[in-house]
Swiss-Prot record:
Residues 938-955 have a biased composition (Acidic residues). GO terms for biological process: proteasome-mediated ubiquitin-dependent protein catabolic process; regulation of protein catabolic process. The gene is PSMD1. One of its GO terms (cellular component) is proteasome accessory complex. Component of the 19S proteasome regulatory particle complex. The 26S proteasome consists of a 20S core particle (CP) and two 19S regulatory subunits (RP). The regulatory particle is made of a lid composed of 9 subunits, a base containing 6 ATPases and few additional components including PSMD1. Interacts with ADRM1. This is 26S proteasome non-ATPase regulatory subunit 1. One of its GO terms (molecular function) is enzyme regulator activity. Component of the 26S proteasome, a multiprotein complex involved in the ATP-dependent degradation of ubiquitinated proteins. This complex plays a key role in the maintenance of protein homeostasis by removing misfolded or damaged proteins, which could impair cellular functions, and by removing proteins whose functions are no longer required. Therefore, the proteasome participates in numerous cellular processes, including cell cycle progression, apoptosis, or DNA damage repair.
Length: 955
């Protein structure tokens, strides 16, 4: 056994090259044991490597590399490993090889990324030896079938050639494509490179044996290429693949921005006419009934039309197909279907609201109850609670009246057809001036009903805002117009809002500043930024500054690194409100990206800024950046949640609520629990609201603490001595927890993984309730119905059942509160003598014995029945009728029933609106549409007027 390497090292001083070679071979064998000794003579080995004439110089490099590796000098070790050429065996599993390969990939990645950011002429050549090792590594991954690893390294090193090769060579191409698309959506920090990767994915998807158009369109949304999407839709119509086209249109509406959709619609309109010449689609017959009848939600549908015969089925004319596609893309169909779902499945527990109403004693809690009611009934069109409590509602005055009127917009969200008729009593009239607060609230409500789907209502709101003579009406009009024209970047709307901003009126300016951001959402419009930042630096009104702070951030929505210059200048501003705007801009520009640089900036500001509002905003903004990986958020904010500064603690609570919304994340709830007992009341408010955001639609099985928190909200509301701030939080939390009749969830991303723009905007503006209660209503933008809606070829809902393969109680609605039984007043007992009392007692006992004997037999049989009932096991599955309420976690266990005639066009596990292919020739049974609540009730009450003609007969 060798105890020293001195003898071998001495051979390196020999003249004979063969002896030196022999020494190197021996040293290579013992280097792991004697590296410390060899390191003293490593210079001799280096000299051998540098000697061009030495035959085994590569071997010298290998030994030197191993010595430096043991010394911890990884860079030198890597250099010599590269010098060793093929002697450095990438397939070896030793720790040395693994470490050097890791360093090699890091080094190569760094060089590639630096090169990618340089212009064409300035790119530095990458070391070929480095590339050689990386290529060997890729080959090793492919040989070992470690495709995900290869894709990861290929994306890290910007090697698109390898990326494409890996996907195509893998044994599961669709799986690898899905994995790559997910990486693209969630982890790619650089927009330019992401777009290149998406182009490669589009190419692969299109070249599949059966092109995957649904995923191609998802990529094209990211690439912001509406023309390519239009081409695909046109191609599908030509090929008579209509159902696929409809499915893509629904997916587009859910994931793409308004501008993107309007471009696709524009392209389809120009396409509309020439398609008629396509063979196979020139049939003269049309679908039974005109396009109007094909509206899935037409309330006037004739009772006889619930069965559609297959024989009547003839290809619809292309124009009709295009108009249907435009109707889907415009969002009209999805909004109507969701409205139907929410009305049909409304499961609100009015007892909760009644108890809260009876407990509140001041105007702040009154407003909170009105807001909570609108959340609970969001989109259900049910204003039952308000109708039952008109006298109580009338207590709202001034801005509370504004908020209460606007809450109708949340209740009737998506109820667009009758919106103007519905809100008529609250809207400005030419004849008599009404209450300004009511009219302003009415205009704001119209915006909430049409949020992100303005259409014709934009022009109505535009005119109302032009003619408004009062700052309160202008405030409501600006908010309504901003909501309806969200993301449209319409110049006429922008100019009018700018005019309102420049009037330097605090009330109007606050709403106009925010609305400017809503209209220019994500446009990165340089002129808009210049106008808004310029005015923010001039104005003396804090309210206007607050509105602009959020507005500026919205203009940079989703712009990632393109917003860095603006963020930099805002963060350096001496005005704390503009620094806060900088935090929101980071949140909006990098939302959902998980960008480390953005997180570092926010964390730095959260602990270093001198202003509490800025620090709070910085921590809140973390939630927006991390929402794709909610499990990371608790660890990031756990220390901040224990900060000495209550504003930072509040921010940490809200960040958890935003990031983990709807997930029921246990770690987040564990962090919030102690905060609900915080000594500072507004921290408790934040913790209560955040807990509801996280636990929305969770059941006791999916999230055991939900009932505990329900009791906590109730306790805080009913405690006469508790603080108003905490009560406000608890009331809002109740509303959020049961939102949309227990049928909606808050999610910042769409089902397909895109950042859901209205949700992000809604949650950001909702957080501003800290300054201005009426902005609470914006949360309704983030409510997404948890539904699966199947549609047939005519875009109607067929009667079909889905099978949920888990126990019904897992995702059941919470049980309603029991109505407390009224206690009977106890009568004062009259005095009874002891002798009579004893006699009565004996009599009673005798009667009791008789009765018991009679009852004995009956009781026993009854008890047996009860036991049998209790023992009856809960079934392991449940059948749900279309349209079905299906929770996100439940989607995994959802399937079509075995004997079902319909086949879904995309997996049910994605949820949402799914086109179903009918495999049967029989008649179809359709789901009858339900009528919306609201104005219909008033009409029915007014109907008895026409008996005037009968009066003449009486005469």
């Amino acid at each position: 056994m060798i105890t020293s390497a001195a003898g071998i090292i001495s051979l390196l001083d020999e003249e004979e090259p063969q002896l030196k070679e022999f020494a190197l071979h021996k040293l290579n064998a013992v280097v792991n044991d004697f590296w410390a000794e060899i390191s003293e003579s490593v210079d001799k080995i280096e000299v051998l490597y540098e000697d061009e004439g030495f035959r085994s110089r590569q071997f010298a490099a290998l030994v030197a590399s191993k010595v430096f590796y043991h010394l911890g000098a990884f860079e030198e070790s890597l250099n010599y490993a590269l010098g060793a050429g093929d002697l450095f065996n990438v397939n070896d599993n030793s720790e040395y090889v693994e470490t050097i390969i890791a360093k090699c990939i890091d080094h190569y990645t760094k060089q590639c990324v630096e090169n990618a950011e340089l212009p064409e002429g300035e790119k530095k050549p990458v070391d070929e030896r480095l590339e050689g090792i990386v290529n060997k590594m890729f080959q090793r991954c492919l040989d070992d079938h470690k495709y995900k690893q290869a894709i990861g390294i290929a994306l890290e090193t910007r090697r698109l050639d390898i990326f494409e090769k890996t996907i195509l060579e893998s044994n599961d191409v669709p799986g690898m494509l899905a994995y790559s698309l997910k990486l693209c959506m969630s982890l790619m920090q650089n927009k330019q490179f992401r777009n290149k990767v998406l182009r490669v994915l589009v190419k692969i998807y299109m070249n599949l044996e059966k092109p995957d158009f649904i995923n191609v369109c998802q990529c094209l949304i990211f690439l912001d290429d509406p023309q390519a999407v239009s081409d695909i839709l046109e191609k599908l119509v030509k090929e008579d693949n209509l159902l696929m086209a409809y499915q893509i249109c629904f997916d587009l509406y859910e994931s793409a921005s308004q501008q993107f959709l309007s471009s696709v619609i524009q392209n389809l309109r120009t396409v509309g006419t020439p398609i008629a010449s396509v063979p196979g689609s020139t049939n003269t017959g049309t679908v039974p009934g005109s396009e109007k009848d094909s509206d899935a939600m037409e309330a006037e549908e004739k009772p006889g039309s619930t069965c559609v015969g297959k024989s009547a089925e003839i290809n619809p004319e292309p124009k009709d197909q295009i108009s249907k596609m435009i109707k889907i893309l415009s969002g009209e169909m999805a909004i109507e279907l969701h409205l139907q779902f929410l009305i049909r499945n409304n499961n609100t527990d009015l007892m909760i609201l009644k108890n809260t109403k009876d407990a509140v004693r001041n105007s702040v809690c009154h407003t909170a109850t009105v807001i909570a009611n609108s959340f609970m009934h969001c989109g259900t069109t049910s204003d039952q609670f308000l109708r039952d409590n008109l006298e109580w509602l009338a207590r709202a005055t001034n801005w509370a009246k504004f908020t209460a009127t606007a809450s109708l917009g949340v209740i009737h969200k998506g109820h667009e057809k009758e919106a103007l008729q519905l809100m008529a009593t609250y809207l400005p009239k030419d004849t008599s001036p009404g209450s300004a607060y009511q009219e302003g609230g009415g205009l704001y409500a119209l915006g909430l009903i049409h949020a992100n789907h303005g259409g014709d209502i934009i022009d109505y709101l535009l005119n109302q805002l032009k003619n408004a003579s009062n700052d309160i009406v202008r405030h409501g009009g600006s908010l309504g117009l901003g909501l309806a024209a969200m993301g449209t970047a319409r110049q006429d709307v922008y100019d009018l809002l700018k005019t309102n901003l420049y009037q330097d009126d605090a009330v109007t300016g606050e709403a106009a500043g925010l609305a400017l951001g809503l209209v220019m959402l994500g446009s990165k419009n340089a002129q808009a930024i210049e106008d808004m930042v310029g005015y923010a630096q001039e104005t003396q009104h804090e309210k206007i500054l607050r509105g602009l702070a959020v507005g500026i951030a919205l203009v940079m929505y989703g712009r990632m690194e393109e917003a860095d210059a603006l963020i930099e200048s805002l963060c350096r501003d001496k005005d704390p409100i503009l620094r806060r705007s900088g935090m929101y801009t980071v949140a909006m520009a990098y939302c959902g990206s998980g960008n480390n640089k953005a997180i570092r900036r926010l964390l730095h500001v959260a602990v270093s800024d001198v202003n509490d509002d800025v620090r709070r905003a910085a921590v809140e903004s973390l939630g927006f950046i991390l929402f794709r990986t909610p499990e990371q958020c608790p660890s990031v904010v756990s220390l901040l949640s224990e900060s000495y500064n209550p504003h930072v603690r509040y921010g940490a609570a809200m960040a958890l609520g935003i990031c983990c919304a709807g997930t029921g994340n246990k770690e987040a709830i564990n962090l919030l629990e102690p905060m609900t007992n915080d000594p500072v009341n507004y921290v408790r408010q934040g913790a209560l609201i955040a807990s509801a955001l996280i636990m929305i639609q969770q059941t006791e099985i999916t999230c055991p603490k939900v009932s505990q928190f329900r009791q906590l909200y109730s306790k805080v509301i009913n405690d006469k001595h508790d603080d108003v701030m905490a009560k406000f939080g608890a009331i809002l939390a109740q509303g959020i927890l049961d939102a949309g009749g227990h049928n909606v969830i808050i999610s910042l991303q769409s089902r397909t993984g895109h950042t859901h723009m209205p949700s992000v905007v809604g949650v950001l503006v909702f957080t501003q309730f800290w300054f201005w209660f009426p902005l609470s209503h914006f949360l309704s933008l983030a409510f997404t119905p948890t539904c699966v809606i199947g549609l047939n070829k005519d875009l109607k809902m067929p009667k079909v059942q889905y099978k949920s393969n888990c126990k019904p109680s897992t995702f059941a609605y919470p049980p309603p509160l029991e109505v407390p039984k009224e206690k009977e007043k106890e009568k004062v007992s009259t005095a009874v003598l002891s002798i009579t009392a004893k006699a009565k007692k004996k009599e009673k006992e005798k009667e009791k014995e008789k009765k018991e004997e009679e009852k004995m037999e009956v009781d026993e049989t009854e008890k047996k029945d009860e036991k049998e009932k209790k023992k009856e096991p809960e079934p392991n599955f449940q059948l749900l009728d279309n349209p079905a309420r299906v929770m996100p976690a439940q989607l995994k266990v959802l399937t079509m029933t075995e004997s079902c005639r319909y086949q879904p066009f995309k997996p049910l596990s994605i949820g949402g609106i799914i086109i179903l292919k009918d495999t049967s020739e029989d008649m179809e049974e359709l789901v009858e549409p339900v009528a919306a609540h609201g104005p219909k009730i008033e009409e029915e009450e007014q109907e008895p007027e026409p008996p005037e003609p009968f009066e003449y007969i009486d005469d």
